[in-house]
Amino acid sequence: MALRTRLGEILRPLNSEYGKVAPGWGTTPIMGIFMLLFFLFLLIILQIYNSSLVLENVDVDWATLGS
């Protein structure tokens, strides 16, 4: 038999929906929006690093990153 702890009792309600699937699309559209925003964030960071996107007073150099 599993050991019952206070923490386990507190966390039990979070696991009550285990195995159940919401009908329809659920939160998939929200996940898609966040994935798109994360992709845009990574794209902007890559462009800044690659100097494709030049910002005033932002110098991308390993020597200046350490100071």
UniProtKB/Swiss-Prot annotation:
<comment type="similarity">
    <text>Belongs to the PsbH family.</text>
</comment>
<keyword id="KW-0150">Chloroplast</keyword>
<dbReference type="GO" id="GO:0009535">
    <property type="term" value="C:chloroplast thylakoid membrane"/>
</dbReference>
<dbReference type="InterPro" id="IPR001056">
    <property type="entry name" value="PSII_PsbH"/>
</dbReference>
<dbReference type="GO" id="GO:0042301">
    <property type="term" value="F:phosphate ion binding"/>
</dbReference>
<keyword id="KW-1133">Transmembrane helix</keyword>
<feature type="transmembrane region" description="Helical">
    <location>
        <begin position="29"/>
        <end position="49"/>
    </location>
</feature>
<keyword id="KW-0472">Membrane</keyword>
<keyword id="KW-0602">Photosynthesis</keyword>
<keyword id="KW-0934">Plastid</keyword>
<dbReference type="GO" id="GO:0015979">
    <property type="term" value="P:photosynthesis"/>
</dbReference>
<keyword id="KW-0793">Thylakoid</keyword>
<dbReference type="InterPro" id="IPR036863">
    <property type="entry name" value="PSII_PsbH_sf"/>
</dbReference>
<protein>
    <recommendedName>
        <fullName>Photosystem II reaction center protein H</fullName>
    </recommendedName>
</protein>
<dbReference type="GO" id="GO:0050821">
    <property type="term" value="P:protein stabilization"/>
</dbReference>
<comment type="function">
    <text>One of the components of the core complex of photosystem II (PSII), required for its stability and/or assembly. PSII is a light-driven water:plastoquinone oxidoreductase that uses light energy to abstract electrons from H(2)O, generating O(2) and a proton gradient subsequently used for ATP formation. It consists of a core antenna complex that captures photons, and an electron transfer chain that converts photonic excitation into a charge separation.</text>
</comment>
<keyword id="KW-0812">Transmembrane</keyword>
<dbReference type="GO" id="GO:0009523">
    <property type="term" value="C:photosystem II"/>
</dbReference>
<keyword id="KW-0604">Photosystem II</keyword>
<dbReference type="Pfam" id="PF00737">
    <property type="entry name" value="PsbH"/>
</dbReference>
<comment type="subunit">
    <text>PSII is composed of 1 copy each of membrane proteins PsbA, PsbB, PsbC, PsbD, PsbE, PsbF, PsbH, PsbI, PsbJ, PsbK, PsbL, PsbM, PsbT, PsbX, PsbY, PsbZ, Psb30/Ycf12, at least 3 peripheral proteins of the oxygen-evolving complex and a large number of cofactors. It forms dimeric complexes.</text>
</comment>
